[in-house]
Curated annotation (Swiss-Prot):
GO terms for biological process: positive regulation of translation; translation. It is found in: Mitochondrion inner membrane. Residues 1-21 form a transit peptide. It catalyses: GTP + H2O = GDP + phosphate + H(+). Promotes mitochondrial protein synthesis. May act as a fidelity factor of the translation reaction, by catalyzing a one-codon backward translocation of tRNAs on improperly translocated ribosomes. Binds to mitochondrial ribosomes in a GTP-dependent manner. The gene is GUF1. This is Translation factor GUF1, mitochondrial. Belongs to the TRAFAC class translation factor GTPase superfamily. Classic translation factor GTPase family. LepA subfamily. It is a peripheral membrane protein. Residues 56-240 form the tr-type G domain. GTP binds at residues 65-72, 132-136, 186-189. Keywords: GTP-binding, Hydrolase, Membrane, Mitochondrion, Mitochondrion inner membrane, Nucleotide-binding, Protein biosynthesis, Transit peptide.
Amino acid sequence: MLKTLGLRSLCPSLGGRGFRRHPNINKYTLSLVRVRWNHHLSNAEIQARIENIPQENYRNFSIVAHVDHGKSTLSDRLLEITGVIDKNSSNKQVLDKLEVERERGITIKAQTCTMFYHDKRNGEDYLLHLVDTPGHVDFRGEVSRSYASCGGALLLVDASQGVQAQTVANFYLAYSMGLKLIPVVNKIDLNVADVERAKAEIEDNFELPRDEIIGVSAKTGLNVKEMLLPTIVDRIPPPTGNKKKPFRALLVDSWYDSYLGVILLVNIVDGKLKKGEKVLCAHTNKKYEVKELGIMYPDRVPTGSLVVGQVGYVVLGMKDSSDAHVGDTLMHVGKESVTDILPGFEEQKPMVYVGAFPSTGTEFKAMDDDINRLVLNDRSVTLERETSNALGQGWRLGFLGSLHASVFRERLEKEYGSKLIITQPTVPYMVRMTDGTESIITNPDDFPDSATRRMKVEELLEPFVEATITLPQEFLGNVIKLCDANRGQQKEITYLNTRGQVVLKYHLPLAHLVDDFFGKLKAASKGYASLDYEDIGYRESDVVKLELLVNGQSIDALARVLHRTEVEKVGREWVQKFKEYVKSQLFEVVIQARAGTKIVARQTIKARRKDVLARLHASDVSRRKKLLEKQKEGKKQMRSVGRVQINQEAYQAFLKR
């Protein structure tokens, strides 16, 4: 298969003689290579064509939409129509390069692609740069970074679903960054499509003129070539940088390649960059020589230079991914005094933390390498080593949300074959001490005990979010009950006149949001509700640490921080569930749930009894009593010194949802 695709000559990393399978190549990658390298221009022709296009004919744009409204499908059609890839029924999610993206049908990592468009109206060529961004709220950092290199965006709305929560959130993000927005109604070919209603919602919610809205079908390509592409050229402004100014570029993204090291995705704000020139990274003050640079088409195509207004990749021979700070400014060495540093991006903070441990202790070293390798390509994950008395050596991982954590785990299992035991997700709590100092607790094991709380802690605070929920009016009662049951505080309720839709705004504890709130919301609304949220800071809360004790010994990996009103219910569920996975011992096993100093629930596993009277004669009463007393004393001693044997499978089963 590799020979027929001609990959050996095109990609030496796949091997020549003595070929072996590369660890980063899977069936999805091979199919993508086959699709992407199907364009008809050589590298020299691509470079020559770019050089003949003036800066005023550049258009950098993104696609703004809710999850599953057709961003990736529209990207595929644009790539086909502009000739980047051939028309092929297998062209699905071409820019979604991760296996987990294709399986889940979502975009996780923002991807970019340059396209050539020939406008028959004036006979001119245009250089279009598309960013396919994620729609889920967990990956909003990817979205905001992508918008920074764009002059405009397509506001995409599903004709059958209308405006949803994340459509609104991403619209305001794009609007606040000054992007020119082109409203587009997608899926107009569906039988259930209500195009006029979708247009009315766009007009009402975003105050965009109805006559500017374009109806398309990303699946069939209807109106994409005839209406959408000319509109992109007409309405989205070209980049405003100056070619004569000293070179400077904004570092938008980075990823790690085992052969080239760290590859940077940059937006050229001013000037020009050529291969062989020396550049300085402002954040680290480190200097590098440009080894290779070019555009994504949609894979790397070396062009020898990048000029103002272009978005492309740069290879500097950088080996440590921590040196690539997203939002950093790149400039020519020696031009530091005449080059202004760009504002950059606000660094995203993790909102969810989990403990991760190998399913068997012997796998720690190999899995440590796998996790570090994956973190290289996802800079939003924080990583620290931690040790558990119950589960041994592991890691404390920080994520942007529960979907982000789930995707990371799935990538680790699918791409590296690594199996993890993941603890319950926890959120960062703030502890304010009596002496005025503050600290953030991300591990329940570090939560202050009862004595410390009495003597040194002024107050405990937990993070809250403002959740925006869009749903049909018929499910309003169910969703309000769900929010109230999760300690929510209703702030606003808006009825959308167009089609019986309601927008709810609630203040919710982040801890409840990451505890499968989205799944519960889908169940309460039969899948029709959509959710968006934003951080609104910390609030004082009566939270306590709930521990699971086995014969008086706390199992640190299972501890959780909960509101005091929830500990009894959760504690009873815990001890009942954990009892199922602990095998009976030769002595009595007591399983307890403890909140602070109070035991809130208990279960007992009776001792496994050995028949010491089996060989006795029935009439030997004194001997019988003596043996039973001896057994009783032995069990008493065993209970005081014996350790309960709990295997890893028990923890894994207990933590599994």
